[in-house]
A protein has these predicted regions:
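Basic, Lys/Arg-enriched alpha-helical interface segments
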Residues: 1-73, 82-88, 97-101
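Acidic, metal-associated active-site segment
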Residues: 79
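Active-site flanking residues adjacent to catalytic metal/cofactor-binding acidic residues
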Residues: 91
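Residues forming the ATP-binding cleft of Hanks-type serine/threonine protein kinase domains
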Residues: 94
Length: 101
């Protein structure tokens, strides 16, 4: 007894066109585990702690204000959290080479 039944309201979400194109491309190719990508998205959307294996971190330089987490290996999810508006923007998916070079 006594378990807490309260939870914060999940963030609202939005997706960029780049994110949607990447999702469709990777989902069609079968190259990466898109179920794992959906799990990672749910973790951040529902304000759950992101496990250390995702290596979630802030980006710097021209990507300052964005975050990145590792879905598996070098497969990355780039997103941005707008705390004031309580929205998570899913920005892109891909490898380091595809996203940052």
């Amino acid at each position: 007894m006594g378990s807490n039944k309260r939870a914060p309201l999940p963030y609202r979400t939005d997706r960029t066109k780049n994110f949607e194109k990447a999702w469709k491309r990777y989902n069609k190719s079968g190259r990466y585990d898109m179920q794992a990508a959906a799990v990672a998205m749910n973790l951040v959307t529902n304000r759950n702690p992101v496990p250390a294996e995702y290596r979630d971190h802030e980006l710097t330089g021209e990507w300052a204000g964005f975050r990145e987490l590792h879905i598996g290996g070098d497969f990355l999810l780039v997103y941005r959290v707008d705390e004031k508006s309580e929205i998570i923007y899913f920005v892109d998916l891909g490898t380091h080479a595809e996203l940052f070079e």
